[in-house]
């Protein structure tokens, strides 16, 4: 069966140990399994505070989490590299220009010494064995991961899989030249793979997901180089195709965490702005008042301006996809759900299952914002509706069957 566009299975709120400050059971987020999403819909989710890891999408709950995570982006047209960032590029350039030491003069027939060559290529996300081997070396050397933990399945799930449903032929009038979706950018020096950038190319800009590099090239600061090259990618597209890329103007860096030094550096790419989760406004991260609020841990409201209207789907009009034993049965609205279930012979008895699901659907509508108006929430009749009739506990089985129909 073809993948279902704009469909998720909302899981709800999740509490886990924090990966930034290591506090136990202190990181809180809302999550969903994304079976299929257009890049436009995912872009709307990003602007509402969501992010993805493979096909898992999540939104940190800033008001109750230990480390407040704010979506951060840069307007590429306004970006100017700092002195330190220019030094990073000069260091790379000096390395590339330096004569290669290959045990010989390395020259051509005329005796000239050849410089190194850096090539950056962008291709749609797919599993590449060479990338996987580089990722394992990076994770072991930089993050201290055990070799036994570095599985191909984890690499695929985290860095290759995506929920995007896109036409691979770019729209010449309204998209970047390479198209939209999930991509890997390979960095090669003289043909050797030295780094990989995992990015999403969305209607409004490039979203940087992950970057890994060869530990032998640590002195080149390739992580900083990649951010500058990704910004340059957006700028180049805007220069070459101004009409097609009028909205393609931002560089998204994921989340900014003011209290975490390894995440705070993102504000160095200036001028950058943070999303205020209360007012739905974007505020300059270097604004004095914003900095005071961040220093005082007043994370919920970064802007003193009035809140912008936030569109949300009316729960009874929201879309619900019904699955039964791994097959999509029907698509309906929450308001029409009870009648549809009766029409296909599903006896809900007290209907407690539908009422409980209705509460979860209302929560999804509120937390997904505008994007949720056109995203279907896929639910399994037996595991998620009928299960509620016999138990007060939420069924926590995997979403493998739902993933199979999407």
Regions found by a protein language model. Name each.
Residues 1-46, 51, 59, 63, ...:
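A eukaryotic "domain-start" boundary segment
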Residues 7, 30-34, 120, 124, ...:
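Generic alpha-helical structural element
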Residues 25-44, 52-53, 179-182, 190-273:
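Acyl-donor binding region in acyl/amide transferases
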Residues 25-31, 73-76, 308-324:
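Extracellular/mature segments of secreted proteins
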Residues 44, 48, 137-141, 158-161, ...:
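Residues that form generic nucleotide/phosphate-binding pockets
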Residues 53-56, 60-64, 72-219, 318-398, ...:
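A conserved beta-strand-loop-helix scaffold within acyl/acetyltransferase catalytic domains
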Residues 72-74, 242-307:
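Active-site/acyl-donor-binding loops of N-acyltransferases
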Residues 166-169, 233, 297-304:
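A general structural signal for short secondary-structure boundary/capping elements
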């Amino acid at each position: 069966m073809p993948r279902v566009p704009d469909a998720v299975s909302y899981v709800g709120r999740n509490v886990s140990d924090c990966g930034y400050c290591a506090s136990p059971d202190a990181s809180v987020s809302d999550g969903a399994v994304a079976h299929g999403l257009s890049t436009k819909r995912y872009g709307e989710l990003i602007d509402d505070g969501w992010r993805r890891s493979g096909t898992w999408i999540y939104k940190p709950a800033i008001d109750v989490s230990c480390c407040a995570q704010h979506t951060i982006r840069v307007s590429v047209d306004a970006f100017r590299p700092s002195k330190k960032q220019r030094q990073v590029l000069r260091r790379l350039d000096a390395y590339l220009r330096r004569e290669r030491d290959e045990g010989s003069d390395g020259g051509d027939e005329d005796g000239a010494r050849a410089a190194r060559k850096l090539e950056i290529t962008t291709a749609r996300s797919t599993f590449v064995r060479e990338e996987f081997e580089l990722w394992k070396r990076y994770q072991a050397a930089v993050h201290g991961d055990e070799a036994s933990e570095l599985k191909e399945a984890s690499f695929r799930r985290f860095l290759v899989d995506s929920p995007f449903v896109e036409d691979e032929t770019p729209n010449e009038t309204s998209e970047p030249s390479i198209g939209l979706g999930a991509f890997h950018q390979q960095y090669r020096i003289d043909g050797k793979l030295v780094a990989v950038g995992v990015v999403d190319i969305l209607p409004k800009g490039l979203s940087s997901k992950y970057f890994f590099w060869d530990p032998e090239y640590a002195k080149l600061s390739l992580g900083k180089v990649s951010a500058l090259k990704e910004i340059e990618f957006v700028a180049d597209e805007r220069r070459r195709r101004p009409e097609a890329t009028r909205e393609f103007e931002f560089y998204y860096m994921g989340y900014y965490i003011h209290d975490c030094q390894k995440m705070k550096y993102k504000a160095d790419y200036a001028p950058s702005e943070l999303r205020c989760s209360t007012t739905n406004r974007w505020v300059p991260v270097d604004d004095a008042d914003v900095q005071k609020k961040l220093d005082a841990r007043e994370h919920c409201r970064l802007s003193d301006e009035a809140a912008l209207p936030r569109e949300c789907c009316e729960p009874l009009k929201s879309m619900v996809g019904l699955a039964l034993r791994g097959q999509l049965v029907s698509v309906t609205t929450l308001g029409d759900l009870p009648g549809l279930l009766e029409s296909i012979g599903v006896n809900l008895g007290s209907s407690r299952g539908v009422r409980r699901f209705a509460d979860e659907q209302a929560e999804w509508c509120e937390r997904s914002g505008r994007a949720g108006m056109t995203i279907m929430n896929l639910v399994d009749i037996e595991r998620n509706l009928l299960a509620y009739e016999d138990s007060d506990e939420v069924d926590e089985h995997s979403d493998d069957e739902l993933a199979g129909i999407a």
